[in-house]
Amino acid sequence: FVLLTNAPRPNSTVIDFLKKMGLKKFYEDVYTSGEASLKYLMENFLNSKFYHIGPPRDFDLFKRFEQNKVSNINQADYFICTGLFEDHETKLEYYKDLLEKFSNKKFVCTNPDLIVDRGDVREFCAGSVAKIFEEIGGKVIYFGKPYPPVYNLSANINGKNVLCIGDNM
């Protein structure tokens, strides 16, 4: 079976992580929402400037075109959201203020989950920022479960039944 995850990272990063945990024998292949979004970006935005919304640990997803990353939001052609900034993890209002005047730009969400529970701590995910962008009138392109593109890209599933087991949104 294919392990499909909403991790905003390349397939290879997650495969390496699973191997270290001794889990290689439990799956045939791995496909991440990060890999799906990367494929889309390489095909559609290869030479465009982007502004990354998310923690630095997620930036390995964009190594192939990091020269297109801008630190000034005003210079961005589009946004890539992998999560929340480390210094703004709890206040979603920050993102509304940050993005309000940019609702005409594309917004790529690499993990549509709204929240994640890490032990006893509940944290916002990239999907929460994407929802705010939609609320201010922006258009979001989602990659990850439950959106169809990630299934279509992860395996040749046309005409096949798919069982998806998730934990939350």
What residue spans do the PLM features occupy?
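HAD-like aspartate-dependent phosphatase fold
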Residues: F1-M169
